[in-house]
């Protein structure tokens, strides 16, 4: 596995996330967007020491709609998808012990680290590591086999 760190430090998720949470499971999800490129969701900050290296690896998101912005409250521990050269990689977007915010909640709580109590939610100090797969619209079996 090609694991690359590119923490999304400018996102509201990263800035407000609980740290030192205990991972108790893994949740994977697909974007369902028909776009396999990691650059759509992951971009470094221009102030990052390795900014140019990361842009070369990922490619530049020319629309600026990646998740490393203050207005994106959602955030995940990792993304799996295509680099600029077409190869597959996993981008770690936050520490494994950082509570993600990538799924909803139900009557029993959430994989985001919260349990439901009557009319509110309470942080329980545990979470499921969450990663998102940048799907290609489920058109290419070879791509599917590589990312899953």
Predicted regions and their residues:
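Active-site-adjacent loop/helix surface patches within enzyme catalytic domains
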Residues: 1-148
């Amino acid at each position: 596995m090609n694991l690359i760190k590119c923490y999304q430090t400018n996102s509201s998720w990263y800035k407000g996330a609980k740290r030192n949470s205990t991972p108790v499971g893994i949740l994977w999800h697909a974007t369902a967007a028909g776009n396999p490129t990691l650059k759509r969701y992951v971009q470094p900050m221009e102030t990052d020491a390795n900014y140019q290296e990361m842009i070369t690896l990922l490619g530049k998101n020319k629309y600026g709609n990646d998740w490393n912005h203050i207005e994106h409250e959602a955030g995940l521990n990792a993304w799996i998808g295509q680099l600029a050269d077409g190869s597959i990689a996993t981008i770690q977007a936050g520490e494994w012990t950082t509570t993600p915010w990538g799924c909803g909640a139900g009557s029993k709580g959430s994989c985001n680290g919260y349990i439901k109590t009557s009319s509110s939610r309470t942080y329980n100090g545990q979470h499921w590591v969450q990663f998102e797969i940048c799907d290609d619209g489920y058109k290419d079996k070879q791509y599917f086999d590589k990312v899953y």
